[in-house]
Design a protein with these regions (language model features):
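The feature captures the beta-strand-to-loop junction immediately N-terminal to the Walker
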Residues: 38-40
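ABC ATPase NBD Q-loop/coupling interface
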Residues: 64-80, 148
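Walker B catalytic motif
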Residues: 173-177, 184
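ABC-family P-loop ATPase nucleotide-binding domains
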Residues: 93-170
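Conserved structural motif at the start of ABC-family nucleotide-binding domains
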Residues: 4-6, 22-24
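Conserved hydrophobic segment flanking the Walker A/P-loop of ABC-type ATPase nucleotide-binding domains
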Residues: 13, 29-31
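Conserved beta-strand-loop-alpha-helix hinge in the C-terminal portion
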Residues: 220, 224, 228-251
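Helical segment within the ABC ATPase nucleotide-binding domain
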Residues: 186-199
């Protein structure tokens, strides 16, 4: 069953004269699946993830997006988050003065209130957090630190996946979460992402490199070029891109034009 259905999605920078970045994206992501989006810089990969999350710096000009049967484009960013969409940022920001513990507890309980569920009390929240911290090999001192303040690049990425594991979304969007990670950190982050895999959830991972896909096995790999998905395949496509680059795909697309 489809969790996410994107049809002919166009989007541009939301400013006077803003240029078009997405130029007709089509994609179907079923529950239980992991799909990877690959492509050169400037191909529209990260823009797609941010448009799906509702970032206001982009304006959708055409197309439709159905998420769990609902019109995703009609929902605010906050509503999308409460409906189970989560974006792990490429460049996680600092939130000085706000502890990770306070931030996460507020996020978890905001989702629970949205679904008319009781809020987690301090003890239940602590049990949940300890489980996820063990999974990601994180020290409990992280919880007392301000969100991402003074964190290394690897710590920020690990913290993003930790937040994702705690919030437990239905659709996880990972925007180059593997960039800048050494092999040990990559393995830990991938374990956190894999913990979300279930028949009711899906992951859309934006990445430059196939090495992430050694740990998060994708059901499909898509290549973006100039704001569109121009080729799809299985994991072997990612290996081919690693070996040959993107020039052959550009030539293939040019011949079909």
């Amino acid at each position: 069953m489809a969790l996410l259905e994107i049809h002919d999605l166009h989007a541009r920078v939301a400013a006077p004269g803003g240029h078009e970045i997405l130029k007709g994206v089509n994609l179907t992501l079923d529950k239980g699946q992991v799909h990877a989006i690959m492509g050169k810089n400037g191909s529209g990969k990260s823009t797609l993830a941010q448009v799906l999350m509702g970032r206001e710096t982009y304006q959708v000009t055409q197309g439709s997006v159905l998420y769990n049967g609902k019109n995703l484009l009609e929902l605010s960013t906050e509503e999308r988050a409460c409906e189970g969409v989560f974006l792990a940022f490429q460049y996680p920001v600092e939130i000085p003065g706000v502890s990770t513990s306070y931030f996460l507890k507020a996020a978890v309980n905001a989702v629970r209130r949205y679904h008319r569920q009781d809020e987690l009390d301090a003890m239940d929240f602590l049990v949940l957090v300890k489980q996820k911290m063990a999974l990601l090999k994180m020290d409990q001192s992280f919880m007392n630190r301000a969100v991402n303040e003074g964190f290394s690049g690897g710590e920020r990425k690990r913290n993003e996946v930790f937040q994702m594991a705690v919030i437990n979304p239905t659709l996880a969007l990972m925007d180059e979460t593997d960039s800048g990670l050494d092999i040990d950190a990559l393995r830990i982050v991938a374990n956190g992402a894999n913990s979300l895999r279930s028949p009711d959830r899906a992951i859309l991972a934006v990445t430059h490199y196939q090495r992430l896909l050694n740990y998060i096995q994708p059901d499909a790999v898509h290549v973006m070029l100039d704001g569109r998905i121009v080729k799809s395949g299985d994991k072997s496509l990612a290996l081919e891109l690693e070996a040959k680059g993107y020039d052959w795909i550009e030539k293939e697309v040019a011949q079909l034009a």
